[in-house]
UniProtKB/Swiss-Prot annotation:
Sequence segments annotated as region (Disordered): 99-166, 328-372
Ranges of compositional bias, category Basic residues: 137-146, 334-352
Biased composition (Basic and acidic residues): 114-124
InterPro entries: ZIP (IPR003689)
Family, as annotated: Belongs to the ZIP transporter (TC 2.A.5) family. ZupT subfamily.
Record's subcellular location: Membrane
Protein name in the entry: Protein zntB
Name of the gene encoding the protein in the UniProt record: zntB
């Protein structure tokens, strides 16, 4: 088999791996959709759990990796660029729940005022008529009282419906914002999986499995608020699917079309910006939504469980795939750096260092690289 044929096979494998990794986001959405009993309390725990996963990814994986590669100052600059960028994006996401609530309140208040004025007017007219007929006055008063009670019941029902619609609109906007953040996060992940798979399946497969593992709770974070707000399984699944498909799209756009522009510095800058996006999304969208349905203590507990889950998923995957370390693993580790587009491999940066010194650094570095 020629080198060109081998390269073409690796490209096909890389694209398939990116597609499978992206589909795991939809798996998280399916889990939420097919839970038999939906409750707001469960939604609060799911949002808190997903917040913990995203915080852990940002501060224990993406940002440390970028700091190591492009420096503390540059990584932090791009981190805050990501925050500003996502804050601007959120301005275009509908958040009309507050306005809706105020508007409904205003309409309700105006309606009540008009009704009161109309009622007073009727009473004046009735008083004039009642001078001639006292019996009719009593009957009309009773009728007016019944009409007021019926009108009040209608207002209460309308107010309840408006309140529910306001809450549903809020949850829907949270889901859309989360989908945008996850989509932006999946673009560089697709590039990472693609480049790693070009180096070989022994490098690409562990990375794909690792990214797929943390895409599942991300899918849950997208689907939970949308499904709770709309009740539409298809809409919740659709947003998860679109978010996940950003991985193969990212691989195609950045890995194939703009391959020559994807420098190590640019990739690490993108990952630092993604860390900022995810942190801001947690602070601005996920946690405030979670606090509406669970207490702060309950939210904190689920948040920490999410971090622990992600921590163990990393080590479980590394224990199941030991060939990525030691011996051939050193070579694989070097490839993994290349796969992420990093600016150095151990053979280059440590030049005269012994093979043993490379092996010592491999497990720690690869644990950071696995989810970049």
């Amino acid at each position: 088999m020629t080198s060109l044929e081998t390269y073409n096979d690796n490209v096909k494998t890389a694209l398939i791996m990116c597609f499978l990794s992206g589909l795991s986001t939809a798996i998280g959405g399916l889990y939420v959709i097919f839970i038999k009993q939906q409750s707001h309390k469960l939604l609060g725990h799911l949002l808190s759990f997903s917040s913990g996963v995203m915080i852990y990814i940002s501060f224990m994986d993406l940002l440390p990796e970028s700091i190591a590669e492009i420096g503390f100052y540059n990584a932090n600059i791009w981190f805050f660029v990501g925050i500003i960028f996502f804050a601007v994006i959120l301005r275009f996401v509908p958040h009309d729940h507050d306005e809706s609530g105020d508007s409904n309140h205003a309409h309700s208040h105006n309606g009540a005022s008009i009704e009161k004025h109309s009622s007073e007017k009727k009473e004046v007219v009735d008083d004039d008529d009642d001078d001639n007929n006292g019996k009719d006055k009593k009957q009309k008063q009773q009728k007016q009282k019944q009409q007021k009670q019926q009108q009040q019941q209608k207002q209460n029902i309308a107010k309840s419906k408006n309140k529910k619609k306001s809450k549903d609109d809020y949850l829907n906007s949270v889901g859309i914002a989360t989908a945008i953040g996850v989509s932006l996060h999946n673009f560089p992940e697709g590039v990472a999986v693609y480049l790693a798979c070009l180096k070989g399946i022994d490098v690409g497969l562990p990375l794909m499995l690792a990214i797929a593992a943390h895409n599942i709770p991300e899918g849950m974070a997208v689907a939970a608020p949308i499904f709770s707000a709309t009740g539409s399984k298809w809409k919740a699944f659709k947003y998860c699917l679109y978010s996940g498909l950003c991985e193969p799209v990212g691989a195609i756009i950045f890995g194939l079309i703009f391959k020559e522009y994807m420098t190590p510095y640019l990739i690490q800058s993108m990952l630092a910006a993604v860390a900022g996006i995810m942190v801001f999304m947690v602070i601005k969208e996920l946690l405030p939504a979670a606090f509406k349905y669970v207490s702060v203590d309950e939210s904190a507990f689920s948040n920490i469980i999410g971090m622990i889950f992600f921590f163990f998923s990393i080590h479980f995957l590394h224990s199941m795939l030991p060939h990525d370390h030691g011996g051939a693993g050193d070579g694989g580790h070097g490839h993994s750096h290349g796969g992420h587009g990093h600016s150095h491999g151990h053979g280059h940066s440590h030049g005269g260092h012994s093979h043993d010194s490379q092996h010592v650094e491999s497990p720690q570095s690869s644990s950071f690289n696995a989810f970049a």
